[in-house]
Design a protein with these regions (language model features):
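Hydrophobic/aromatic beta-strand patches that form the interior of the parallel beta-sheet core
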Residues: 4-6, 34-36, 82-84, 108-109, ...
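S-adenosyl-L-methionine/SAH cofactor-binding core of RNA-modifying enzymes
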Residues: 63-112, 119, 156
Length: 273
């Protein structure tokens, strides 16, 4: 898969692609990373890519001439690539979008914004706008790197096991369960016994419980209506005994943890009062 960036600061892209998983993926020929600098399409001594906005206002706006010329050059190299402009006004990146990109079979051209953003006419040469969240960064290079990293994890051979990507948080629709490694005991904190049992059925059950509990506590918006009902509502009458027992145990654990947290908050209030 090929990733071509249109950044004002290509060294940020080159630096990110020269380390860790991305570097190994590139060395194996699984991904190709390159840049086209819009400054190379300017015609003044200062290589100017921005100008003041019509109508007034703070900041500078990226000029259409060098940006569009760079996009044209990128499309010459990757004629079938999807052109994505990184900007706050785009649709927000989610794991489902990452997987859509990864399985599309397409290459990607990332156009990186800066300053107050793009001249609106630049978007005529863009397939879609993409944001990584509801906050503003200095430039679009880091968001574009994040998207490349997320996509690359789904390319066969990039990770040790493709399951590593498929089992990550958000790929399953749930937050990830806690992970542990050696030593068994660290400063009085022990690895849960179930993870050392070798019983994979029990381990999988424990992991699912932890994922559901974490998601309910931290990101309930990720749960489906059915999952929320199983965790907090009435259990269906027709249900396998093993499944019913699983959710009854899980609900009891959730209730106990909520009671424990409430008790700790009361003690803290009393101490501060």
């Amino acid at each position: 898969m090929k990733f071509l960036f249109v950044p004002l600061f290509p060294e940020q892209i080159e630096q990110a692609a020269s380390h860790s998983i991305l570097q190994r993926a590139a060395s194996k020929g699984l991904i190709e990373v390159s840049c086209i600098n819009p400054r190379d399409f300017t015609h003044d001594v200062h290589r100017t890519v921005d100008d003041s906005p019509f109508g007034g206002g703070a900041g500078m706006v990226l000029k259409p001439e060098p940006m569009v010329a760079a996009i044209h050059k990128a499309k010459e190299q990757l004629p079938n690539a999807r052109v994505i402009a990184m900007c706050p006004g785009g649709r927000t990146l989610k794991q489902s979008i990452v997987e859509e990109y990864a399985h599309s079979g397409q290459d990607f051209i990332f156009v990186c914004g800066h300053y107050e953003g793009f001249d609106e006419r630049i978007f005529h040469w863009v397939d879609e706008k993409l944001s990584i969240g509801d906050y503003v960064l200095t430039g679009g290079e880091m968001p574009a790197i994040i998207v490349m990293d997320a996509i690359s994890r789904f390319i066969p051979g990039v990770l040790g096991k493709i399951e590593s990507a498929e089992e990550d948080s958000f790929s399953t629709g749930l937050l990830e369960y806690p992970q542990y490694t050696r030593p068994v005991n660290f400063e009085g904190m022990e690895v849960p016994e179930v993870l050392r049992s070798g019983n994979h059925a029990l381990i999988n059950s424990w992991r699912l419980k932890q994922s559901l509990k974490a998601t309910l506590a931290l990101r309930p918006d990720l749960l489906s209506a059915e999952q929320k009902e199983l965790l907090t509502g009435r259990l269906p009458y027709k249900m396998k005994k093993s499944e019913r027992r699983f959710y009854e145990e899980l609900r009891a654990e959730i209730a106990a943890e909520q009671e424990k947290r409430a008790g700790a908050e009361v003690k803290e209030d009393e101490a501060n009062g």
